[in-house]
């Protein structure tokens, strides 16, 4: 299986048909140490990411062959997406369907579990981040009276609280590689998803 040359994602299709190749041919890996991440991770979370059909923001620079290799090594695959997309169908693993547009609530609930159970790198946060205490106050409900628990997010996302807790605990205890897709509302984001739109 190779990346879809007739992808609905504008850049990839255009590059393949205009230049005869995509930027992936002969390009370096701009997303850091992809090889190192894949060699050392125990779990990959594909969050709104379908690199088998469209590269999007995260650009799928590790490629189909590397994803297959990670699967053969026994790396657990988790897919968070409203749809059982091509990548999740191809690689298998756990699919967590989330209602469209509700990912922030899911992220807040995962963060709640990490903070509540101490499943984050406290030294890294203390040395390399700013604003953590204010954000923590919001997540824990100290700011607005609504703790962002897995139970809190369930009516909005449709993801059962026990699934969120299990994911957060596993993610917090394993070396996890986040393969996030799309670009949100930034460059190309609106058109680089199956349900996106062209704005120009």
Regions found by a protein language model. Give the residues of each.
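Long, well-ordered, tryptophan-enriched scaffold segments
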Residues: 71-78, 83-174
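Catalytic-core regions built around general acid/base machinery
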Residues: 61-74
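Glycine/threonine-rich flexible loop motifs
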Residues: 50-64
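A glycine-rich, hydrophobic/aromatic-adjacent loop/helix-cap motif
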Residues: 1, 167, 171-200
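Flexible loop/turn segments at secondary-structure boundaries
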Residues: 10-11, 52-55, 85-88, 104, ...
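Short acidic, glycine/serine/threonine-rich loops at helix termini
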Residues: 16, 55-59, 88-93, 107-111, ...
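Anionic-ligand anchoring segments at beta-strand to alpha-helix junctions in alpha/beta enzyme folds, i.e.
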Residues: 1-40
């Amino acid at each position: 299986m190779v990346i879809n040359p007739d992808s609905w994602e504008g850049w990839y299709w255009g590059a393949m048909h205009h230049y005869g190749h995509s930027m992936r041919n002969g390009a370096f890996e701009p997303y850091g140490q992809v090889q190192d991440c894949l060699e050392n991770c125990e779990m990959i979370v594909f969050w709104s990411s379908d690199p088998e059909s469209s590269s999007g923001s995260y650009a799928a620079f590790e490629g189909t062959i590397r994803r297959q290799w990670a699967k053969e090594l026994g790396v657990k695959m988790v897919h968070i997406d409203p749809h059982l997309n091509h990548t999740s169908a191809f690689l298998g693993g756990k699919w967590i369907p989330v209602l469209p547009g509700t990912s922030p609530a899911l992220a807040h609930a995962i963060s709640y579990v990490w903070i509540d159970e101490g499943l984050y790198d406290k030294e890294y946060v203390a040395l390399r981040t700013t604003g953590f205490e204010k954000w923590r106050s919001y997540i824990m409900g100290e700011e607005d009276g609504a703790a962002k628990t897995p139970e809190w997010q369930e009516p909005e996302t449709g993801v059962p609280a026990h699934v969120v807790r299990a994911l957060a605990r596993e993610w917090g205890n394993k070396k996890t590689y986040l393969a996030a897709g799309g670009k949100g509302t930034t460059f190309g984001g609106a058109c680089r998803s199956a349900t996106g739109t062209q704005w120009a």
